Each structure stands twice: as structure tokens, then as C-alpha cells.
Amino acid sequence: MTSADLNTLLTELTLDEKILLLAGKNFWETHEIDRLSIPSLKVTDGPNGARGAQILDGVPATCFPACVSLASTFDRQLAYRIGQALGEETQTKGAYVLLGPTVCVHRSPVGGRNFEAFSEDPLLTGTLASEYVRGLQSEQETRRFVVDEIISERAIREIYLKSFEIIVKQAEPWCIMTAYNKVNGHYIDATPRWLTEVLRHEWGWEGLAMTDWGAGSCVESVRNGLDLEMPGPARIRASDLVHEALKDGRVSESDINDRVRRFLQLLDHVGKFCDRKTTPEERAVDKPEHRALIREAGAAGIVMLKNRGNILPIDVASVKRIAILGPLADVPSAHGGGSASMTCHYKISPAEARASRLGNRVEFVYSKGAHIYRALPDLLEGVTAASGTPGFLIEYFEDHNLQGQPFETQVTTRSYFTTLDQIEIKPRAMSARMTTTFRPTEAGSHYLSLSGTGPTKLFINGELDELRVRYSFEAGMEYEVRIEISMPNATIADIYILDKQLSVHLGFVPQAEMDQNLLHEAAELARDSDIALVFTGNTTQWESEGQDMEAMTLPPYDTRTQDKLIETVAAANPNTVVVNTTGSPVELPWLNNAAGFLQAWYAGQETGNSIADVLLGDVNPSGKLPMSWPRVYEDTACYGNFGFDSQVSKRVEYVEGVFVGYRHFDRHWNTDKQALYPFGFGLSYTTFGVTDASLEGAVWDSDAQTTTVSVSVANTGDRAGAEVIQVYICPPAIEGLERPVKELASYAKVVLNPQEEKVVKVDFGRDAAAYWDEAVNKWRVVPGQYTVLVATSSAPDDVKSRLSFEISEGLTFDP
């Protein structure tokens, strides 16, 4: 459809129809205008797979590795292939827009959404996310809602905006979602600064800006470039509010036309005007080629951080008995929580993968070793609803106090429900009651947990109990369990999408299971085995969108049961290998006692197979850390300035400025604050030589001109493997301005057979040498001598060659 066609269509819309298109119809779809054959558009989460409309028990979907795992590959081509596959998956859910990727720069290791994002480095984030977006489009947190983030213009430009700038200029995404929080005193959608001046004017972006499930203002958002409010139905853009703003002149119809035009352009981009049929049914399509891609990508992202005595890969010929231990040994931790959660086609746990790969050739013994519950598991056994069917009866009432007759009833087999996808139309006030008859099979003082999105009460045989309780049950007796919940009074200052929503979870664990001595059992099994594999990490309860982590440690934070497990097992067996599944670094107090350590991230539905491929040597680990790994949280640049729960002002000051990640740790090298593992670090089963580095071209008269580093890389070992050549630039000193010691300029990954050698070329341009000059609001390259480091990590010991070039005349350029 031409621009003229879109303008004609715009003129045919009535004012009320245009206002309707300013916001969504429901949680995932926009309005259709049948009179003009304008179709509805469906969007879907998330960054690691197309989940579909149902948040709970939805149509099965394919779960890909998290973006932090993808970042560890340093592989642009792989990111493009993942994007292509996600485009195909999006279509199976009847959607035309995938709400991903997340490209926030990692500022703190306790950020709850780090796993969804790529890296602490804006260049690595921007280049890999660009390929992800290009591939996708080729086919078709702690009170983050109100926090005011105070950031210098230089830090914004050099660190936090840079990855977005790279993506916009390289991949031209069709949609961008805005954040909830303020930046320097203003909500993102309440000022023309970001959406209009930076995105559209400076960078020339022409896509659609939508809210990340909640917006803060009607007038400001319409005037300042926010095109679509999601989810629907409209709240801040309700028809009466927009008409009122039009009447008193705070918003013009021209403003509305600009917003609707962007929406129509998006419909055209995704082909909806060629495919005007109603939203297709969601389908579960499990493609073998996507299975293989996920397994490949998951293994490529695994980072080997320790391999004492070459304990890995496991020598199956000499190993007779392997202990598989840990809370995540038989639990496939495929993804983090929040938008990344989904109902997968399947998930392979490490224990399942070991058994399927080695069969009877090796004896396996298993122990869970530690409990890491935050909320206890669902109560599934021995529960009967009032109708006599297994499960729970849920009754919904049109007030806050369970008065009158329920307007809807449901039966669920799980002890969890949410109205986010259970009821399409909800009253202005609502409460619910969930009941069951519970007949336990064993006696004991069993454990229960309760959580809810509003005021929630648990009754057992009519008695009110606390949120987390132990209750003495007799085997075979019947107990009436009742949960009552009323609607939360959610506001923008809390959790926008939970306004007028109800969610409840009841958890249960028998006393015998909770109180067993897991540590002793694990130690005994480890002692009698040739090698002990300990699988640790986070679950969706501990690492999720919507909440930051309470500490840079393995959970539970109070008991530290996972750390105790590793220490106990390593004391029993020196051949202990830890495989950790988290989206961020954690403290490693046991590291000196473990023989091996793999960081596996969230590798998707093939996670167990990907881990097995690396442990058994079928895949040579080539992952590199996309962030620095601190020894303790106190060593990070943002310590004391992350989150604001203890601050009345609700302000977070980015006092570290541009010194994020390795830019910070470079200041502290060879001190007690030196990073435990540097950015870009990762071990291999083979060895590499990096020699004969040279440099060509260093005059940048335009953005198109590049400088090329050529280097010879040889595989000097006896296994095929891959190395990542990382090129860093060290700028000359500037009086009165501190710059990072070095910054990543570019990188390249090379795959080599044993004894093979290749020449690798790595290009970078003037952006790599520039800093943001706040005095003139331009990028500036100063004259002087620049040092180029050719390295295999950001650590000084991993620099393989030093080159230099001279800039005789400085230059400035616009964003």
C-alpha cells in the first residue's frame, strides 16, 4: 500500500474510529474497523519464543535460548537464524508482531530481567539484537513503573541509548516499546525528547512506538509520539478522555492522525492489508529444524569458566559411575519468568539428557541435594472440587466482598489461577473464592504457601491461617480448603497490568519430603562416584521480569542451600563439576574446591541436550561472558545505587556514568575489586594462537569509512573449536574528562579445525573512537594516538597484540 493509499484511508476514518485505534482491543489484539476493512493486529510475547495469548497453560510453543545465552555466542549469523525461526514461530500463534528482543544494557548483576537482555556492552547488544531483528522481520524488575532514573547525557548516549541506536540504524525495527519509568524527571512518553527528537528526527526511525503494557498519560503520550497504548481496552486513551483533551485544545486531531498513520503503516509492513482475515487459531507446530537450532545455539552459548586438570569433557571410557545432583538436575530450567515464560512443546532436563545419551554404559545416581522453593509446588493430588471432579472450584463475584451469586464459575486441576487470560470482560470490582476438599495420603505437619495479587486469605476447615503455614493433617481425612481474594487497587505506581486482575497460587509439600536430609544423601552418592555433576541456578520464581533479585547469590538467599550443597559435594569428591543456570553472575564461594564450572544460562527447551553435548565433548565450548563476573555484589559500579526501595525520593542516580561493566572493572584491575572473570572470557577444549596483527585505514571522513584489523588465528590443539577475536580501542587522554581505559570496537568469531589457521578481518568505524560531547550535543573524536588491542577477553593478560593509529585532526558528527 502506497503512502497516498494510507493517507486516503486515514481521511475515511471517523474521529471516533481513529480514537479507537489509539489503543488495543484486548490484552493482545488491536481493534478492527470492518467498515473500511482495517484488520485487527495480534501481538505476542516474548523474547525467546512466541507464547501466544494464554499466559497459563497455553498452546505449546517453541522455547529458544534467552538473549543472554545468545549474547555469549558472539555469533551474528546465529542471532540472525534465531530471529528467522522466531518469525516463523510468531505466525503459528496467529500473531504479526513479536514483543522482543529486550535490549537494556546490564547495569547490575541483580537485575531481574538481565537474562532477557544481551550484555553489559552496548556494541555487543546492538549488533546481535540487530541481527535478531533482521532475521525476525525477514519472515514477516524493582518498581520499574515509577522509578526516576537520573543519568547524565553522556552515559545515556554512550551506554544506554547506544544499543538502540545501532538497532534502529542497522535493522530498522518496525516497532519499539517504551519503558514505564522516568528518565531525568520525565516519563518516556511524556516528553518529545525520546520518541520524537531522538528516535524520529535524529535517527530517522519511521516505525510504531507502543507501550510496554501500560502508559502514564493521555495528552502527553498522544502529542509526543506514542502511537499505540497496549494492552487494551483503552485506559489512558479512553474515548471520553481523548474527546475532553480535544475539546480543550490539549490534543489536536493532527496529533491523532500522526499516531493512527503509524499504526496503518505497521499493518501494511506486516502484510495485514493483504491478509485481512480474522486472527488465525493458534497452532502447536514443533519443527525438527527449530529443535536442532535451539540445541546448537544453547550449546554455543555455554561458557566454560573452569576446567582443572581437564576434567572435561567427561571421559566415558574411564568413568563408571556419575552422580547427578542438585535441584536443577531433573528440572529443565529452560527460561526465566515473566514475558519469557511459556508452555513448551517439551523441555529436556540434564538428567534426561544424560540417560538418553549414555544409556547403560555408565551408572547414574541422583539426589536433589537442596530445596530452592520460593512458592511451593502446586497441590495436585487428593483434591476434589464441589462437583466431584478432581481439582478446585473457582467462583467470581462482582464486588470486593464475595457477595451475591457468582457471575462465573470454573474448575481447574491446578492450585493456581489468573484472570489475565481466564475472563475476557471483567467488572469494575471483583473478588473470587477457590475451594476444594483435600484428602492427604500421608499424615504429617505439611507445608503450605499462599500468594495472591490482592488481599488473600487461606482457610482450612474454616480456620484462617497465615500466608506460609504448616498444618497437621491426618492421612485419609477430608479437609475443606478455601481461599478468598479481592481485587487489588492497582495504579500506575504499582503494577499497571494487574489493575482489575486476580491471581492466586496455593503451594504444598509433604513434611517427609521437605524435612529429609538431602545434603547427607548427596554427599554419600558423590563420595562413591567417579565424578559428581551439580546442577544449580535460578527458577522462574527467583529470576523474573517484574522483580529484581535480592542478592547476588544462589537462592534461597537466607539459607544458601545450593552453596552448601556444592561445598559438601566438593568435599566428598574432588572431581566435582558445577553447571549453573542463571541469567546473571552469582557469588561463587566454593569455586576453589570445584574442579569444573560451566555457566549454562537459560538455553531453551533443549537445555539438557545442549549441556550434555558440552559435558561429553560432542560440542567444544566456545561461549564468552557477555558481562563481567564480579566476586561480590559490593564490587559493582552501581552498588548502593540500584533499586530505590529504601529511598523516599524514588530516584536512582547512575553515579557511575559510563563506567558500566568492564569499563568499571578496568579501573580496579590488580586490586581486590578485580572481576573474578572478565568480560569476553571463556575456556575451550582446544588452544589457539593469535599472531600477525595489522591495521589498515584510520581516517574517517564519513560514517561509511572503516578501519580493518587483520589477524592470523590458528587452532593449535587436537579438537575443532571456535575463538572470538575482540578488538578494543584505548583513546588518548583528555584533560578534564575521564574516559574508559578501553571500549569494545568490534569482534569476530572464527571456527577452526585442528591445526587449521585463518586470517580474520575485523572492521570498525569512527563510532568506536568517539565520545558524547555534552557541551555541543555531538559525537567527538579527538586528535591523538589511539591504541588498538587485539584480545580474547577484556583482561590485560588476554591481549594478544597492540597496534596504534594517529588522528591528526579531530572531528564531530551528529547522532
What are these regions (language model features)?
Residues M1-W772, K778, Q785-S794, F813-P815:
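Glycoside hydrolase catalytic-domain context in secreted enzymes
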Residues P783-G784, I807:
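A short, compositionally biased
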Residues D797-P815:
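Short beta-strand elements
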